[in-house]
C-alpha cells in the first residue's frame, strides 16, 4: 500500500493556496488605493438652533400655596384663622387653661382604662383562686370517701376473722400438714 497523506480539515495544501490568495489580496489593495472617497460633509447648524442654545431658559418656581402641600401640625398661636382643609377632629385651643383641661380629661380617661384593666385582672385572679379552692375541696372529699371505704372493708374483715378465728387456725394447721406430706412434683407439657 502507498503511504497516505495526512488530510487536515479546514487547511488545504500551502503551495496551491498561497499563489491564489496573493493575487486576490494585491488586487483588493490596489482597488482601495485607487478609489477616492469624497470629503466628509460638514453639518451646519441652523440659525434658530444657535439662538436657542445661547438663551438660558428660566424655569418657573412655584410657591407653597400653588403647590398646595400639607402643613405639619403645629401649635397655632391665638388669633390665627383656621386653615381651609381643617380635619374634623382637630381642635384649636385659644387659651392655656382650656388646653390643660382637655389634657387632664384625656389623662383621666387613660388612667380609668388602666384602673379598669387592673380591676379585671383582680377579678380574674379571684375567680382562679375560687376555682382552685373548689378543686382542692373535691379532691379532699374523694380522699375522705376512699378512706371511709377502706375502713369499712377492714372492719368487715375483722368481724369475719374474730368469729372464725378458732376454726381457721385448726384448718390452716391441718392444710399445712397435708401439703408437707403430699407434696408432689408436677410436670406440664406445653
UniProtKB/Swiss-Prot annotation:
Superkingdom of the organism of origin: Eukaryota
This protein's GO CC annotations: nucleolus; preribosome, large subunit precursor
UniProt-listed GO biological process terms: intracellular mRNA localization; mRNA transport; ribosomal large subunit biogenesis
Any GO MF annotation of the entry: mRNA binding
Coiled-coil residue windows: 109-165
Biased composition (Basic and acidic residues): 39-49, 129-151
Keywords: Coiled coil, mRNA transport, Nucleus, Ribosome biogenesis, Transport
Biased composition (Basic residues): 181-190
Main location: nucleus
Keyword Transport: yes
Subcellular location: Nucleus, Nucleolus
Disordered as annotated region, ranges: 1-70, 129-190
Annotated Low complexity bias: 1-29
Known partners and oligomeric status: Component of the 66S pre-ribosomal particle.
Role played: Required for efficient assembly and nuclear export of the 60S ribosomal subunit.
Family designation: Belongs to the LOC1 family.
Protein name: 60S ribosomal subunit assembly/export protein loc1
Organism: Neosartorya fischeri (strain ATCC 1020 / DSM 3700 / CBS 544.65 / FGSC A1164 / JCM 1740 / NRRL 181 / WB 181)
Lineage, highest ranks first: Eukaryota, Fungi, Dikarya, Ascomycota, Pezizomycotina
